[in-house]
A protein has these predicted regions:
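Canonical Rossmann dinucleotide-binding motif of NAD(H)/NADP(H)-dependent dehydrogenases/reductases
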Residues: 2-29
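The beta1-alpha1 cofactor-binding region of Rossmann-like NAD(H)/NADP(H)-dependent oxidoreductases
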Residues: 50-62, 91
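C-terminal helical subdomain
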Residues: 157-160, 168, 172-173, 177-180, ...
Length: 227
């Protein structure tokens, strides 16, 4: 049985990913900062729960000790951050987004790496966005080209590059990054055109690749996403 941990998974895309992975018979840890909400949702779904705040080193280390064994890590936790106009955006606004969306990936990956390297087929799936794609944000035909969100977009671009660097440095693991697509979640006021089920297709597929599977790729449910 594959043991999978999904960060930030007490709602939205993370919750749906947990639900679908459980449906396919996997052993899934629902990880969330909010212990009360996380434990409640985990019980509803039939998942195991671990409290994990991706911005807190001690919380991450404690989660590793609780989990003990892991095959697949899905770095899903993320925030939209401030909606301030660009001229009013502060360094603190950007730092808050980077701390969760980028440094959170680094903290969690570093802490769980020994478990993943000890697995028969260790996998990491990082959740980015088309808003982190140079190609998508410069293509007038795509919705991403009409979004101005410097902190969020730059954070997701960083996640894409982090993924390719991890993939190069850790060839024993399969490490990929996915774009959920424009999905209806609270991050966009539920304005997205995809369902959360559609938004979890790519991460579900990449979570279950074997040793002969791809690594260092950027995909969505339709295929390759432009860098």
């Amino acid at each position: 049985m594959t043991t999978i941990l999904v960060t930030g998974s007490n709602k939205g895309l993370g919750r749906e990913a947990v639900r679908r992975l459980l449906e396919h018979g996997h052993d899934v840890w629902l990880a969330a900062r909010d212990a009360e909400a996380g434990a409640r949702i985990a019980a509803e779904l039939g998942a195991r729960f671990v409290q994990l705040d991706v911005t807190d080193d001690a919380s991450v280390v404690a989660a590793v000790a609780t989990v003990g064994r892991l095959d697949v890590l899905i770095n899903n936790a993320g925030i939209a951050g401030s909606h301030a106009e660009v001229a009013d955006l502060t360094a603190a606004d950007v730092q808050a987004v980077l701390d969760t969306n980028v440094l959170g990936v680094v903290r969690v990956t570093r802490a769980f790496l020994p478990l993943l390297l000890g697995a028969e087929s260790g996998v990491i799936v990082n959740v980015a966005s088309g808003l982190g794609s140079q190609g998508a944000t410069h293509d007038p035909s795509r919705v991403e080209s009409h979004v101005v969100a410097p902190a969020y977009c730059s954070s997701k671009s960083a996640v894409v590059m982090l993924t390719t660097q991890y993939a190069q440095a850790l060839p024993a693991l399969r490490i990929n990054v996915v774009d959920p697509g424009y999905t209806a979640t609270d991050l966009n006021g539920n304005q997205g055109t995809q369902t959360v089920t559609e938004g979890t297709d790519a991460r579900g597929a990449m979570a279950l690749v074997g040793l002969d599977g791809p690594t260092g790729t950027f995909t969505d449910r339709s295929g390759t996403v432009p860098w």
